[in-house]
């Protein structure tokens, strides 16, 4: 559909590849681990049935240097000692890891060709910035409430709906998306990451500020 609509972002090269698998292994249930490595970062957390979910995104140019996923993990991801330990102490539950290529974090339009985009169609946020599914539900909630309000007030028009949705989407998500892109770039630089973590550890309020600007506020209940 994106190709058929000739959306701007689809014309640009996608630079990311994602790899995901479930494992049997130990990891604190109350934590979500984030481990940077050359050209990407990895998230680790416990999910349903006490499974260990390990998912990482890596720049395509870095991935192409290696024969396969196993070599990439051993040569690149294992350079992070914490991540290496997790992999070596875990047992995979998948016959083959799940992969998604051509991932684009380029800016997208929330309204295109008079189509209201929700979820990833309106903008794909970096995984380090929160729950993409929650954002999809939230954007759908915004659309439904705008339509409901306009119909009840007998003020519905396509133009007004499109403008109102674009404005509210920008207010709710635009800053989070931008912050996510900046943080992802920082994670790709080991030196900057190391210095940044030390600063955040020294100033806890800064960490709360980052969380607020990447994860947003709770979805408000319908009035």
Predicted segments with their positions:
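Alpha-helical elements of the RecA-like P-loop NTPase motor core of helicases
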Residues: 2-3, 145, 208
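Short capping/connector residues at structural and topological boundaries
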Residues: 10, 28, 39, 52, ...
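FAD-dependent flavoprotein oxygenase/oxidase catalytic domain
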Residues: 58, 81-94, 98-101, 178-198
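Predominantly flavin-linked oxidoreductase catalytic cores and closely associated redox partners
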Residues: 1-86
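FAD/FMN-dependent oxidoreductases across multiple families
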Residues: 64-147, 152
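Short, well-ordered turn and helix-capping elements at secondary-structure junctions
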Residues: 23, 38, 58-60, 101-104, ...
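C-terminal helical "tail/cap" subdomain of flavin- and related membrane-associated enzymes
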Residues: 148-223
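Generic structural signal for well-ordered, non-membrane alpha-helical segments
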Residues: 12, 66-70, 108, 114, ...
């Amino acid at each position: 559909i994106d190709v058929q609509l000739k959306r701007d972002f689809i014309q640009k090269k996608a630079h990311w590849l994602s790899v995901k698998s479930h494992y049997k292994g130990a990891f604190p249930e109350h934590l979500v681990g984030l481990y940077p490595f050359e050209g990407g970062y990895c998230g680790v957390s416990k999910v349903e049935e006490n499974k260990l979910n390990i998912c990482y995104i890596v720049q395509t140019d870095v991935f192409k240097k290696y024969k396969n996923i196993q070599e990439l993990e051993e040569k690149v991801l294992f350079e992070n000692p914490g991540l290496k330990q997790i992999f070596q102490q875990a047992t995979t539950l998948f016959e083959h890891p799940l992969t998604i290529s051509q991932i684009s974090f380029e800016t997208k339009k929330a309204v295109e060709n008079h189509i209201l985009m929700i979820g990833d169609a309106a903008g794909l946020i970096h995984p380090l910035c929160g729950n993409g599914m929650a954002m999809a539900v939230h954007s759908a909630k915004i659309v439904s409430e705008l339509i409901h309000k306009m119909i009840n007030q007998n003020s519905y028009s396509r133009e007004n709906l499109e403008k109102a949705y674009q404005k509210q989407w920008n207010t709710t998500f635009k800053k989070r998306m931008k912050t996510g892109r900046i943080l992802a770039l920082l994670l790709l630089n080991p030196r900057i990451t190391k210095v940044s973590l030390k600063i955040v550890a020294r100033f806890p309020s800064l960490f709360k500020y980052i969380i607020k600007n990447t994860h947003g506020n709770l979805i408000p209940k319908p009035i």
